[in-house]
Amino acid sequence: MRKALLLLSVLALFGCSKAVNTPVLTIEGGQVQGVTTELPGVIVYRGIPYAAPPLGDLRWKEPQPVVPWQGVKLCDKFGHPSYQAVHYPGGYTTEWGYGDESPYSEDCLYLNVWTKASGQPDKKLPVALWIHGGGYREGWGTEPEFYAEEWGAKDVVLVSINYRLGVFGFLTHPELSAESPHGVSGNYGILDQIEALKWIKKNIAQFGGDPDNVMIFGQSAGAGSVKTLCESPLARGLFHKAVIMSGGGLNIPQAAPAAAPAARPGAAPAGRPAGMPANMSAMRFRPMNIKEAELATKEVMDWAGLTDLKKMRAASTETIYALSTIYNGASGKYGSITGSPMVDGYVSLESFDDAARDGSLADVPYMIGYTLNDMGNMSAGIAAFCENRQEKGGKAWAYEFARPLPDDGSHPEVTARLKGAFHSSDLWFVFKTLKYCWRPWTQGDWDLSEKMLTAWTNFAKNSDPGLGWEPCTKENPGFMLFKLDANDAEASEVGTPIVP
């Protein structure tokens, strides 16, 4: 019942969106008109194409220029998410209220803009590019927890994107590499993100944004994408600060939780719930080797009779998506088709860890953190990254989200899997989208969300989150601890919490 009411409220909100008196903007490809939101002055532009549909001969190619359109495009509907598996009820599917999104498609290169300064290029508001997570194989930039009208109300122009996922976003193959002028294949999803940054550089002033003050931020695989962008030479100069959420820090084998020698009185003891693998996330986002990936993909494609690019590109979306699974079942062997970023010598020259340590990482301010019940012990790797930034003359702010999400017992299919301050639980708070969720939020939750939204938007504006939050350094290894009360953080990993 609650989900039905949530869906009705979202539909009603969209139904009330109007293009009455909203500015018509001229951007790359043609003219666009946005629609109003429920927050005064905030306009959203949904489903703006930022590249040509990657279909047919453009499958597994770098993003190509957007196809121009005639007349004024009314941007009142979100674009297609990248093709992915159907999501069944339970866990994250129910938590995020999936089910009302556009059909999944390879035609997915669309972005959305929330702004209070549409048609005012002199405003020069800070810009934030949101990159969604989902293991590089699922998710989209317009899930309900990502609705960004609150960011617009804080005078930040927020852009969210869809990008190619899974086999469509990261496949490598020897013939694709031979076809490429750069001699490599894969990383198409990262190239999509870079194309979105280029789109921002060329077009965001029309929405009141400053192309010279751009923050990139992402969570989980979105954080992994941010890490790749911070290492990639192709993204250099297109962004000016970065936020890494639940993407780990530096990889430290057998890392113990970060602990300061002189923790504040009452600080929670270091610890991790039993059974949680150590340092899982930091390893998860290490790029793959391209030659290994090419050979593995070729084996599967050849088995299916897709022995050249013409056949590979002529195969249906469904065939390509299911191919690895079919191969595994029919052959009795494990077949792997690339599904994540890799070091290729073009988009990515080395791992994030290596770039951080050799000093070639993007020299920008960083925010980096995790949730208490995240996908492994991240605090030590995060502290190590912050120390690394200090050694290189930069700054990084660290945080832990320690608020266990409230539960009224109405969705056991969710809470059986997602407990406490679980992986991704901070997203409702960062976007201040609690109203779209079924959970019984308290006033304290709303207040905490406002603090987090303020910190993130402050960072977008000023490269400093404020709130008395100081950079994490070797001498001052403090993590901002986002919580409601002392009970929220009784299992906190951090040695020196900073409470807002």
Give the ranges of each region predicted by the language model.
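A short, hydrophobic beta-strand element of the alpha/beta-hydrolase
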Residues: 216, 243-245
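Alpha/beta-hydrolase active-site loop
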Residues: 106-108, 182-206, 289-295
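Alpha/beta-hydrolase fold nucleophile elbow
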Residues: 207-219
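Non-catalytic accessory segments of hydrolases
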Residues: 16-187, 211, 372, 441-449, ...
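Mobile gating loops/cap/lid regions near enzyme active sites that modulate substrate access
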Residues: 85-86, 325, 391-500
